[in-house]
UniProtKB/Swiss-Prot annotation:
The keyword Kinase does not apply. This is Putative 4-hydroxy-4-methyl-2-oxoglutarate aldolase. It catalyses: 4-hydroxy-4-methyl-2-oxoglutarate = 2 pyruvate; oxaloacetate + H(+) = pyruvate + CO2. It comes from Mycobacterium avium (strain 104). Belongs to the class II aldolase/RraA-like family.
């Protein structure tokens, strides 16, 4: 499903006080600073095997929201996984945790937002959950809803709105 990008500030103006605007302050780390698409989710803690498996599938222009528990101890995404996501048609990644290879990520045509960076690799046991509601910064990211992301922040709109 292709979603036309709209600036988050315009969405806030149009939707009004009930807007689902994420309060968490993510760093813009990917080469694409504006992205939008249907949400898929992964919840994993310091383990990126499930995340890599999901990004190995066709993304269809989607946005993968990753709840890493806010951990900055290990990176959940690096250049190899980000390139896998880009090659499989994902529009962007929103990571409640750390990423690595930030210089390489800036040169890739994919959106990547994360709390920060850490060069340490994560474990690879496959622990985690997929396609579950994830609440970050006062907003629930529900699979199938639409995420819009730019330099101003992240807004979530219910599918069909």
């Amino acid at each position: 499903m292709t979603v036309s990008f709209r600036p988050t500030a315009d969405l806030v103006d149009d939707i009004g006080p009930d807007v689902r605007s994420c309060d968490l302050q993510f760093r813009q780390l990917g080469g694409r600073t504006e992205f939008a698409g249907p949400i898929s989710t992964v919840r994993c803690f310091q383990d990126n095997a499930l995340l890599k498996s999901v990004l190995s599938e066709p993304g269809g222009g989607g946005v993968l929201v990753v709840d890493g528990g806010g951990s900055l101890h290990t990176a959940l995404v690096g250049d190899v996984i980000a390139e896998l996501a880009r090659a499989n048609g994902w529009a962007g990644l929103i990571v409640n945790g750390a990423v690595r290879d930030s210089a390489a990520l800036r040169g890739m045509d994919i959106g990547v937002k994360a709390l920060g960076t850490n060069p340490r690799k994560s474990t690879k046991t496959g622990a985690g959950e997929r396609d579950v509601d994830i609440t970050l910064g006062g907003v629930t990211f529900t699979p199938g809803d639409i995420a819009y992301s730019d330099d101003d922040g992240i807004v979530v709109v219910a599918a069909g709105d």
